[in-house]
Amino acid sequence: MPTIQQLIRNTRQPTQNRTKSPALKACPQRRGVCTRVYTTTPKKPNSALRKVARVRLTSGFEVTAYIPGIGHNLQEHSVVLIRGGRVKDLPGVRYHIIRGTLDAVGVKDRHQGRSKYGVKRPK
């Protein structure tokens, strides 16, 4: 417990809210170029080969972003749009690639939840 004199000398500092996606620099999305596309394995109770990409952003950051959906066409030098949103079982992956924009095509044969995977309405 501080004394009144200590509180006069320097006041209480409000706790700072840290952003969960610093590479976006307070923007909703950022564009970037894939530097490496690879698969990685998730944390302990889960088992899979998760598709991720190392992306160099226009903000200067290099981040790891998750590629959602089944199958993708991304390779090195692909231009992608990323949004915030972590993948719980992949440590260090705090961003998602947005499907259906720039070089990332939408998921093939997707009929439900299409808006999340960049798929147009089937005729």
Swiss-Prot record:
> Mostly located where?
plastid
Gene Ontology terms: cellular component:
chloroplast; small ribosomal subunit
Keyword Methyltransferase in the entry? The reply is: no
Membrane-spanning regions, if any? none
**In its UniProt record, which GO terms are filed under biological process?**
translation
Keywords assigned by UniProt? Chloroplast, Plastid, Ribonucleoprotein, Ribosomal protein, RNA-binding, rRNA-binding
What residue spans carry the Polar residues bias annotation?
A: 1-20
Q: How does it assemble?
A: Part of the 30S ribosomal subunit.
Q: Which NCBIfam families match?
A: rpsL_bact
As for family, the record states: Belongs to the universal ribosomal protein uS12 family.
Return the protein name: Small ribosomal subunit protein uS12c
Species in which this protein is naturally found: Zygnema circumcarinatum (Green alga)
